Amino acid sequence: RQPEYADFRWNCETLYCVEEFWKQASEEDRADFARFVKEGKIGISANYLNFNDLVNADVFGKRLAKWQDKLQPFGTKIHTAMAADVNGFSMGYRDAMIENGVEFFFTNVHCHHGMYPLYQNQNAFFWENASGQRLLVWNGEHYNLGNVLGLQPNHAVNWMMRNRLGE
């Protein structure tokens, strides 16, 4: 309600937190939540939890389909998935997202747990399945651009930042 916050957007990093809210919310709260999603004031990630690369793709796909069905009567759906600190995803995970209408996958690889694919971070690519369907992926690092832009206070410059900044 304050003009200086008009462009603020809350992002639910995982579907689990949305599911827990939904369990205790009134019908009015659910409708308000869905309206905020539709208006772009709340973002919902298709990612259920930030587990690891061994998530069961069938279970994930069924859970995601359930949520797309729940949001459909409100005139909205989940288009984007965001994952943090998970350094790999299966082709089945990709297919579950594609099959359930997810178009964009934003991933933040945690370099303390492993390294970026082909040692390249902060780049985009299309992840294509055998039938030619594609998912647009942003391959970022933990804190996304926060380290490179210096948004993390008192953070020592590391070799990855120097490399990214061309120093």
Predicted segments, located by residue:
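Catalytic-domain carbohydrate-binding cleft regions of carbohydrate-active enzymes
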Residues: 1-167
